[in-house]
């Protein structure tokens, strides 16, 4: 993109965007999906504000918007939708709920992102190998071919699950040690961010197990005995 195009793009106003829309013979904004998409793609406030989160499967607001958001989560709420509809109504005369819903779906899908994948791809390796020393460093395990191999396998599986969701990996890394040894802390470190970690699996027969798994990267099953108390 040329510098001139970038400057012009950044200087767009709501009036500029209105000029890009289709209007009726009487000058009213047509209630079309195309018009709504044009607004969401070009409005100085809404542009790139709504993205589909491939990890959670939900739509997120990822930048500042002209209404108060009391929830720390980026996930779009009903209140966000109401405020967005009011913004489109006030600035562009777009009021059709069907049109707005379709426009949001199209644009968010065009702007989809994966927070963990984006994080991984932002990293630059400093040339220092760490996997082979992870278990000895954090948990005091003996450094051996086994501890090195099992950690490499687990980390490769974690990365693979991000790039190929659902890839087969049915091996559990089991840590045995006294309470307070740092086992849970270790898994939290692996998850990088608290919201990507969960230890909320009390029972395998929990009817909400799939919902609890969603949106997390590293899952800790606190007690292995749960495997034996749940029906197979």
Q: At which residue positions do the language-model features occur?
A:
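N-terminal nucleic-acid engagement/recognition segments and initiation subdomains in replication
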Residues: 1-130, 145-149
